[in-house]
């Protein structure tokens, strides 16, 4: 994921894992009448950089795969990125975040199980002798399972089938930039070496990273709701293939074009539109016009939406030995992380030590 020179030949370490792919509802509303509705899976990624038992930075990314019959729509949403600042870093944060994010974007080693069928329906549809004997054995008195004869029936082995995904992908990278003192690490704002950026500096930082890892992509879009196009262009004028706007469908209803991501201002506003029963008339253009008047875009500092896309990408799926965890294990880790006081060196060091012992 990171070359040795960035890790300074072992001086820095990393934590990285992802969750097993899990079926969820589509982040974009798809009408029930749609023929060939896709299945959607979600994968959570977490990365942290360590230095001498201290956390330096962290990155959380959510990947959504919408699986159609002949292509996959892949959304990569940057959920949170944060630094700790307990010590002065000898490594540039952007030099780490760029390659890690690019790795997550390009990763195609997911093992996605076939959707589970009802176990009862599977048994009823299988009239084999083995299945009938197993049913009969279950009805026998408790004494009979202890007899050798009745235990000769081999246990039924679980057969896991994995999906074969279409080789064509459409990539969508989405980043929401908003200045904050802390995104991942509680109390880290107290630390002397944490570099807190204002909205404009944060936006420029993200654009430089994203531009470096998306060379050759079809579209690079920037939207600053509430800002005029001239103010927006100042941030992207030195990048030849960037323009003002967004990467989602321009026409139609917003609810059928704009995805709902966690802790995303677009998603929060879209949920409000749904609650107010305005989704049947809210077009995409009207949605973005009203979005500019939301409170989080009117607080004075620069808040932006970045989107990049690449169409009809031919990919090769591969097996990989990446560390995976269950959803419950992931949530347990994140809850543990959020309980740490990241202004306390001892507490942070103990957190890292406990994590290593658990592996």
UniProtKB/Swiss-Prot annotation:
This is Histone acetyltransferase RTT109. Its EC number is 2.3.1.48. Belongs to the RTT109 family. It comes from Candida albicans (strain SC5314 / ATCC MYA-2876). The gene is RTT109. GO terms for biological process: DNA damage response; filamentous growth; filamentous growth of a population of unicellular organisms; negative regulation of filamentous growth of a population of unicellular organisms; phenotypic switching; regulation of DNA-templated transcription; regulation of phenotypic switching. The keyword Electron transport does not apply. The active site is at 264 (proton donor/acceptor). It is an enzyme of class 2 (transferase).
